[in-house]
Regions:
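Non-ligating segments of multi-cofactor redox enzymes
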Residues: 1-220
Length: 220
C-alpha cells in the first residue's frame, strides 16, 4: 500500500459517495495476515443522494444500506487486492471503535461516542478494506482531541441522559423516541447533532432513515 494507491482508492470511493476516514496500522497483523486497514464512511452531504438511486434503496429490500455497502465496498476491495470487513458482520466481529482510535483521526468524546476530525459525532462506518502490505506507509501522528477546547454541548443534549454514566441506556432512549411519531429525536440523535464539527454535513432525510432503521432493529 502506497500513498498513490490510497489516492486512487479515494477517487473511486468518492464516485459512490464514500470517503477514507482514516487508516489503522496494526502492531500485530490482524488475523495474522493484514498490516493495515482503511476505514470507510459516507462522504456527506453527497452520500445520501447517491445511495437513494441505488437498486437496494429503490427495491425495498431489507437492510438496504448494509447490502449496498457490501456490494460497493466488496467491489472496491477486489479492484485494489484488499479484503473488505463490515461493522454489521459477525464472523469475525470487527473492532471498528478500537481501530478508529488508532488512526490518528478519531477520539473518544465526553459521551464515549467516537468523534472524527472532520465529521464530528455524525461519523459512521460503512466498512473497511484491509491490506497485507504496509510498504513503510507513515500514518499521521495523533493530534489533540477537539473536545479539549469544546464546551461539550453533547453532554447536555439528550433529553433522557441516555448517554451519560459511561453507558448507553437503550431502553430510556427508545421509550422517549417511541412516545410520539413527531419525536424531536427522529431527525437524528440530538447528542450527535450538537457536535459543532461537521454538524451541517448530514441531511435530515438521511438521519430519519437511520433512526427509523435503528428503532426497527431494537423492536424487531
Amino acid at each position: 500500500m502506497t500513498k498513490n494507491n490510497i489516492l486512487k482508492i479515494e477517487i473511486v470511493l468518492k464516485e459512490f459517495g464514500l470517503t477514507n476516514l482514516g487508516i489503522v496500522v496494526f502492531n500485530n497483523r490482524f488475523l495474522k495476515k493484514y498490516d493495515i486497514a482503511m476505514l470507510i464512511g459516507p462522504d456527506e452531504p453527497f452520500f445520501w443522494d447517491i445511495f437513494k438511486k441505488s437498486k437496494e434503496f429503490t427495491s425495498g429490500v431489507k437492510n438496504p444500506l448494509n447490502k449496498w455497502s457490501k456490494r460497493i465496498i466488496d467491489s472496491i476491495a477486489k479492484k485494489f487486492s484488499g479484503t473488505a470487513f463490515y461493522p454489521f458482520q459477525n464472523n469475525p466481529i470487527i473492532p471498528f471503535y478500537d481501530w478508529a482510535l488508532n488512526t490518528g483521526k478519531f477520539w473518544q468524546s465526553p459521551v464515549k461516542l467516537l468523534v472524527h476530525e472532520r465529521r464530528g459525532l455524525m461519523v459512521s462506518f460503512r466498512g473497511a478494506i484491509a491490506f497485507e502490505n504496509r510498504n513503510n506507509l507513515n500514518i499521521q501522528k495523533k493530534k489533540n482531541s477537539p473536545c479539549l477546547t469544546c464546551s461539550a454541548p453533547c453532554v447536555r443534549a439528550c433529553p433522557v441522559n441516555a448517554l451519560n454514566n459511561n453507558k448507553y441506556d437503550v431502553k430510556s432512549c427508545m421509550q422517549f423516541i417511541s412516545k410520539s411519531k413527531n419525536s424531536i429525536c427522529i431527525d437524528g440523535c440530538l447528542v450527535r447533532r450538537e457536535c459543532p464539527i461537521g454538524k451541517s454535513y448530514r441531511k435530515i432525510e438521511q438521519s430519519r432513515f437511520h433512526m427509523k432503521h435503528f428503532i426497527n432493529e431494537v423492536y424487531k
